[in-house]
Curated annotation (Swiss-Prot):
InterPro entries: TonB (IPR003538), TonB-dependent_transducer (IPR051045), TonB/TolA_C (IPR006260), TonB_C (IPR037682), TonB_pro-rich (IPR049924)
Compartments in which it is found: Cell inner membrane
GO-annotated cellular components: outer membrane-bounded periplasmic space; plasma membrane protein complex
Region annotation (6 X 2 AA tandem repeats of K-P) ranges: 97-108
GO molecular function per UniProt: energy transducer activity
Species: Klebsiella aerogenes (strain ATCC 13048 / DSM 30053 / CCUG 1429 / JCM 1235 / KCTC 2190 / NBRC 13534 / NCIMB 10102 / NCTC 10006 / CDC 819-56) (Enterobacter aerogenes)
Name the record gives this protein: Protein TonB
Gene3D superfamilies per UniProt: TonB
Amino acid sequence: MTLDLPRRFPWPTLLSVAIHGAVVAGLLYTSVHQVIEKPSPSQPIEITMVAPADLEPPQAAQPVVEPVVEPEPEPEPEVVPEPPKEVPVVIHKPEPKPKPKPKPKPKPEKKVEPKREVKPAEPRPVSPFENNNTAPARTAPSTTAATAKPMTTAPSGPKALKRGDPSYPQRAQALRIEGDVRVKFDVTADGRVENIQILSAKPANMFERDVKTAMRKWRYEAGRPGTGLTMNIKFRLNGVKMD
């Protein structure tokens, strides 16, 4: 009868198994100890009140002054001298000589003819045979006879064909008022009266309207116009007169 002996394991394997077993056992012990251990009772919280005056304010951080770096001065631009300006040459033109004034032409002198002097007739010696009652000798007529000026006739003005008297205002007639009116008017080429103007009226604002109404109906001969003609119209209780 034969016995089977267990095989021998190599020692490195055994060492590895032992290390792993120790690690596993340590982990199990730690976990079990944490579960079983009771938590310690909570300790009271202490609060300390601090007065605000006791607290020192934090020191303000001093700003860091950076050194001012002065910029380098820029180089001054070179001054370029301006070229000399050309002075324009002024050419003086000769002033024109004034033209000589034309000499006035001598006026032709009128020749004055000398007047002929008429010598008086010398008396002749009286002959004893001549009659003493003879008429004296006639003197020659003067050569300077006065020239007669031609007579000019003024052209006749427009000839009136229809010129009725102005009517006497009833108010003036009732009050027995008389008056005078002086008018100025023009006569057209077809014989009508226009531009009637009252030059004077006494008394005023009494006869003027009736005078203008009558003059607008006047008619003169056509083709003989006239301007600035005047007329005096007299209002009398016994009638109206025009001149």
